[in-house]
Amino acid sequence: MLRHATAYLAGLLFALTAAAEVVDITPAGFLLKHEVAVNAAPDAAWKALVDVASWWNGDHSYSGNAANMSIDARPGGCFCEKLANGGGVSHMTVVFASPNTVLRMTGGLGPLQGSGLAGSMTWRIIPAPPAAKIEVSYSVGGYMQGGFDKIAPAVNGVLGEQLNRLKSLIDTGRPAAPK
């Protein structure tokens, strides 16, 4: 498990994606935003979004396998990951779910989980007939040793990669290859 956690952190720190945008970094936290157009109606985009195991890159997981990841898209639901030893990881908690339009979760992904942070990630699916747009924002605040200047761009890269994989899944039936 330590090997996977180390690989997860290394990937998180070095992944970069062109579609990523760091909106703001301050001593108190950071804000990330991304947007893509997809060739699907909002209901199909929602179905793909909540089937996280089909598009998340397993290199950015503790188990090393995206098939172990799930999102229970209802208030109180979990963005969770099963571990081989019978354990698991609660990456985020669903606090708002409006099918086909908004999914909001709170928590810290990866190494952010072990720091004194609060995070809010919002996925919006916006009709853009005949298809849709997907917007994701992630706001993180609190205390992090060393500050946010290095970690925010890395988290941004990983989030951008995941959004690109989701877009590829929706548009082509297959997630984009890992970078």
Predicted regions and their residues:
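Positively charged n-region of N-terminal signal peptides that target proteins for export
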Residues: 1-4
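Beta-strand/loop substructures that line and gate deep hydrophobic ligand-binding cavities in soluble
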Residues: 110-160
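Short beta-edge strand/loop motif at the mouth of beta-sheet-based domains
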Residues: 52-91, 100
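Hydrophobic/aromatic beta-strand elements that line small-molecule binding cavities or substrate pockets
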Residues: 34-36, 90-96, 119-127
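Short, highly charged C-terminal tails/helix-capping segments
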Residues: 168-179
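Bacterial N-terminal signal peptides
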Residues: 6-17
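Hydrophobic ligand-binding cavity/cleft-lining segments
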Residues: 18-66
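Hydrophobic pocket/interface hotspot
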Residues: 45-48, 79, 94, 105, ...
